[in-house]
Design a protein with these regions (language model features):
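A conserved SF2-helicase RecA2
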Residues: 382-422
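A short beta-strand element within the Helicase C-terminal
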Residues: 148-151, 367-380, 403-407
Length: 422
C-alpha cells in the first residue's frame, strides 16, 4: 500500500496538481518512510526535499524544516508522526505546510484516527480542507467494530458515507442497548446492522487487496517498527552506557561483565530495570504503546514474543486492559505447567482469544500456532536458534497464509545490534 501511495503522489506531481505531500504515520513507521520507502519507490526523475518532523527542534533541524518553504520546482515532503497532532507545535507547523503548498495529505495506519473524540483526530480533521487530495492507508480499516470507519472516512470526505454526524452514523449501523452502571444510564453497542449497505458505500472510494490474493508474496514477510527512548529511559540508558552504572529510585546497579551490561541496556530499552537487589523497576517507555498500535492493525490472531518475563507480564496486562479480559493468554516461565495446555487450547479454539504472549525459551519449541499469521517480537535475544524456532511456531505445516513478522526496535540502542546480528 505504501508504494501505491508514492506512485499516486508522483503521478499528481508530474501532472502539476501538487507540489507538496504531508505523510502522517505512527511513531514506529515514520523513520521507515523517510529512510526506506521514499528512497526506494519515488521515481528518480522527481527532485524532492523530504524532512522528518522531530518534536525537539534544534538549529540543524530548523534549517531542514525551512527548506520545505523555499520556492522551486522540487516536490516537498513532510513526514510527521500522528502524535505530533496532539501538540500545538505540531498542529501549527502542519497547517503552515499545507497552506504553503498544493498538497496531498495521507494518513498511514489510519485506524490511529478512528476515535472521533481524540485530540489528534480532531486536529487532523480540522486540516482536511487545507489539502487538495487526501488518502488513508490501513491493513485493517475495521479494528473492533464498523463504527471505527466514521472518522477515517470523514477525513477523506464527510459526504462519502452520507452522514455528517458520528451519532447519526452510529444510529444507522449499530444496535444500541441501555445499561445502568454505577447508577448511571449509558448507551452501549450490542451489535451491528445494515453492514451490506455500508460495504456498498465504501466500494466507490476504496481499494482492498488481501494478502492471500497477492500470489507473489513470500512465505515470510519482515517489518520493523522503530521507536525512540523516552527522556527518562535515555537518561538511565546513557548513564549505563557511559559509566556502567545506573541509578533508579535510589538503587545502585553495577555491571559485572559485558553480557550483563548489554542485557541491562536492553532491559532499559524495554522499559524495565533489574537492580542488584533483584527488584524490578518499570520505566515509562514508547514500546508498549507501539505494540498496541501494531495490534490494533492486526486482523485475526497474533503471537507476541518477549525476551524477558517482565515483558510478558507487562504486555499481557496491557493487552487484557486494551482488548478485554480473555483476549489473550500467556505462556512463559510464570505460567503453571497445568495451565499451559489450557492456554494453547484457548488460543487455538476460542475466536475471542486473539493474542498469545510468551517467551521463545518456553513457547518457542514443539507447539503449533498456525492459527496466527502475525508474529510480533516485542523484544529479542541474541540466540538465533530460539528466534528461528519461535518464527516457525506459525510458519509450519497447517499455515495457509503468508506470515508477517514485526520487530519493535528502539533506535540507537542495543536493540538494533541484536536484530542485525540475527
Amino acid at each position: 500500500k505504501t508504494k501505491v501511495l508514492i506512485d499516486n503522489v508522483a503521478m499528481l506531481y508530474d501532472k502539476g496538481r501538487i507540489d507538496g505531500a504531508l505523510i502522517v504515520a505512527p511513531k514506529g513507521v515514520v523513520s521507515t518512510w523517510y529512510k526506506q520507502e521514499l528512497p526506494a519507490h519515488l521515481p528518480d526523475h522527481i527532485e524532492n526535499v523530504a524532512v522528518l518532523w522531530q518534536a525537539n527542534i534544534n538549529k540543524k533541524q530548523q534549517e531542514k524544516l525551512d527548506t520545505l518553504f523555499k520556492t522551486g520546482h522540487d516536490l516537498h515532503i513532510l513526514i510527521m508522526n500522528v502524535e505530533a497532532f496532539s501538540t500545538e507545535k505540531g498542529r501549527i507547523f502542519a497547517a503552515k505546510f499545507l497552506r504553503s503548498h498544493k498538497s496531498l495529505m495521507a494518513i498511514d495506519e489510519s485506524t490511529t484516527i478512528k476515535n472521533p473524540k481524540a485530540k489528534r483526530t480532531k486536529a487532523i480533521e480540522s486540516m482536511r480542507t487545507l489539502s487538495l487530495y487526501r488518502r488513508i492507508l490501513t491493513g485493517s480499516p475495521v479494528t473492533r467494530n464498523p463504527l471505527d470507519l466514521y472518522s477515517q472516512c470523514e477525513f477523506l470526505d464527510p459526504y462519502h458515507l452520507d452522514h455528517t454526524s458520528y451519532y447519526s452514523f452510529r444510529t444507522r449501523y449499530a444496535v444500541m442497548r441501555t445499561a445502568n452502571i454505577a447508577g448511571r444510564s449509558i448507551q452501549l453497542v450490542s451489535g451491528f446492522k445494515n453492514l451490506g449497505e455500508l460495504s456498498d458505500k465504501l466500494k466507490p472510494f476504496s481499494y482492498r487487496v488481501l494478502k492471500e490474493d497477492c500470489l507473489d508474496l513470500p512465505g515470510k514477510i519482515y517489518m520493523k517498527r522503530e521507536i525512540t527512548l523516552t527522556p527518562e529511559q535515555k537518561k538511565v540508558y546513557d548513564e549505563m552506557k557511559q559509566t556502567a552504572l545506573a541509578t533508579l529510585n535510589g538503587k545502585r546497579v553495577t555491571t559485572v561483565n559485558a553480557l550483563t551490561q548489554l542485557m541491562r541496556l536492553q532491559q532499559i530499552a524495554c522499559g524495565h530495570f533489574t537492580a542488584d537487589d533483584g527488584s524490578i523497576q518499570n520505566i515509562k517507555n514508547n514500546r508498549i504503546e507501539e505494540l498496541m498500535d501494531v495490534l490494533e492493525e492486526v486482523e485475526g490472531k497474533a503471537i507476541i514474543w518477549c525476551h524477558y518475563q517482565r515483558d510478558v507480564e507487562n504486555v499481557f496486562e496491557r493487552v487484557s486492559k486494551r482488548f478485554g479480559p480473555g483476549s489473550g493468554v500467556h505462556y512463559y516461565g510464570g505460567t503453571l505447567p497445568e495451565e499451559r495446555d489450557k492456554a494453547l487450547k484457548n488460543f487455538k479454539e476460542n475466536p475471542d482469544c486473539r493474542f498469545f504472549v510468551g517467551t521463545p525459551a518456553t513457547g518457542g519449541y514443539g507447539i503449533t500456532l498456525t492459527v496466527a499469521n502475525t508474529v510480533v517480537y516485542y523484544s529479542n535475544g541474541y540466540d538465533l536458534e530460539k528466534r528461528m524456532q519461535s518464527e516457525d511456531r506459525a510458519h509450519r505445516i497447517g499455515q495457509k497464509k503468508s506470515v508477517t513478522y514485526v520487530d519493535i526496535i528502539t533506535d540507537d540502542t542495543v536493540d538494533t545490534k541484536i536484530v542485525k546480528s540475527l
